[in-house]
Amino acid sequence: MTPAELLAFLQEFYRETSDLFTSRQNTARSVAGYDANNGYQQVIGRQEVHLRWLSDAIASLGGTAADSADQISGTTSSENVKSIIDRDAGNQKAFVDRWTSIVPMITNARHRKLLELILGEMKEHLRILHQAAESRPDVLGRHADGKVLRGTVIAARPKN
C-alpha cells in the first residue's frame, strides 16, 4: 500500500467514524435514562479520542481530516428509545464488520494497529449499547454498596 493509498484509506475511515460520531451525539439527546445516557457519554468520549488519533495519523501523512457534513441537531426523537439504540448499534456493527475485513490489508504496522485498536473498542461499545437498549442499571458497572441510581437526564442544557 503506497503512502497515498494509506492516506486515502485513513481519510475514508475517519469520515465514516465521524459520521457515526455525529449520529451518536444526536441519538444521545433522545436517550434520557440515567444509566443508558451515561453509557452513551462514555462511548462518545472514546470516539472523540479515536477521531483525534485518526486526525493525527492523517496529518502525519500530510493530509487533513474532513469532518462529517452532518450537523448535530438540538432535537430529540419521540421514537421508542430501544429502537433508537438498536438502530445505532446496528450502524456500529455494520461499520465494524465492514472495516474488520479491510484493515488487515494495511501494510503499515503502526496504522494497522491503530485501526485494530479502534475497532476493538468499537466492539466493546456494542456491548454498552446493547445493555443500554435493555435499560440495564449496570451499563457502566455496579456500585460497591449495591445502590442503584434511577432517573433521567435532559437532552440539552437550558439556555439562560
What are these regions (language model features)?
Residues 1-160:
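Iron-associated oxidoreductase/ferritin-like identity signal
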